[in-house]
A protein has these predicted regions:
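A short, structured loop/turn motif at beta-sheet edges
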Residues: 80-89, 117-125
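Outer-membrane beta-barrel domain signature
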Residues: 102-104
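A solvent-exposed, acidic/Ser-Thr-rich amphipathic alpha-helical stretch
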Residues: 6, 24-86, 107
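A short hydrophobic beta-strand element
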Residues: 86-98
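Hydrophobic/aromatic beta-strand elements that line small-molecule binding cavities or substrate pockets
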Residues: 75-80, 95-96, 111-118, 131
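Short, low-complexity N-terminal intrinsically disordered segments enriched in polar/charged residues
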Residues: 1-33, 146-151
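Low-complexity, intrinsically disordered terminal/linker segments enriched in charged
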Residues: 108-111, 119-121, 126-151
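A short local loop/turn or secondary-structure capping micro-motif enriched for an aromatic residue
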Residues: 48, 98-100, 134-138
Length: 151
């Protein structure tokens, strides 16, 4: 594994730690705060969050209050492509498991991710991030593939 791969994976590990802590506002520390318009798309969102106001409202809709009883995010199978000395593109997967407060049952799933990073003095920082779930057709194909084959 090369040094750049290790550096990018460390950022994802820190994101996992922050999600686990439920101090979502701390995610901002992983982003290029000089970028006026960061892009963010979570798989459950209908549209992009663009700009710091949108990101803050997504990460901390009610500052100091937690709607989740527990959350666990795990990034895996990260692959990177250096675009220049200043930019790196990354793809991979995220596994999320969460439990909302109240009677709602826990749930989880896997989603594809991609991210764009910019090199800063203090290291690599996110400038864009997106999650994309599989389509229903792909889910069905995978389910059919798991069925026992009947002769």
């Amino acid at each position: 594994m090369n040094d750049l791969q290790i550096e990018i994976e460390k950022i994802f590990k820190e994101a996992e730690r922050i999600w686990d802590s439920q101090k979502y506002g701390d995610l901002k520390t992983l982003w290029d705060e000089d970028d006026p318009n960061p892009f963010y798309l979570a798989e459950e969102q209908a549209d992009w969050k663009i700009g710091w106001d949108d990101l803050r409202k997504y990460w901390e809709p009610l500052p100091g209050k937690r709607m989740l009883e527990a959350i666990r995010m795990r990034f895996y199978d990260i692959k990177i492509k250096s675009l220049s000395d200043e930019y790196v593109f990354a793809v991979g997967w995220v596994r999320h498991d969460m439990k909302m407060r109240g009677p709602i049952k826990a749930w989880g799933g896997d989603a594809r991710i991609n991210a764009l990073f910019r090199k800063k003095k203090e290291g690599w920082k996110f400038i864009a991030y997106a999650e994309s779930h599989k389509t229903p057709v792909i889910y069905m194909q995978e389910l059919y593939g798991k069925w026992l084959k009947i002769p």
